[in-house]
Amino acid sequence: EAPAVPRPPFFGVRVEEGLDLATIAHYVNKLALYRGQWGYSRKGLSREAWQALVEREAEPVFQRLLKEAMAEGWLEPKVLYGFFPVAREGEELLVFSPETGEVLERFRFPRQRGGGLSLVDYFRPRFAAPLGDEADWMPKEAFRAGARDVLGVQLVTMGEAPSRKAQA
């Protein structure tokens, strides 16, 4: 168990827009992009053959699209991120409204085979005794409703243009 619940910089959601594409490009997980979104597969390929395929086919397309997007401005990068009060209840993670303490969402995560761990096991139980000063900084209504931990979330989008361009 953690020695204390980490205090987030804020509760709720924030949005960042107008991000610099050149900066963002450095953080793209290209392997996930090429395999998960673009459909490239390493199946049956050696490490060297896979690398050659990526360098010959995928990377030039990525660089061309990045250059076009920067010149034409058709990508609209946006990041939504936030922190929410949460608590574990049985096999579910409850997400509370920072303003009202109402349960906004319940998430059920799979458990590892053989009764192993689940992501929910890493969160504090509902109405657990505080580990530190979280009763002082946790949103009051959420704390009263049993929130004893914090969940950080993020969502990244590039807008609708990439899908339209890919289908063209």
Regions found by a protein language model. Name each.
Residues 1-168:
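Active-site loops and adjacent core secondary-structure elements that bind or stabilize anionic groups
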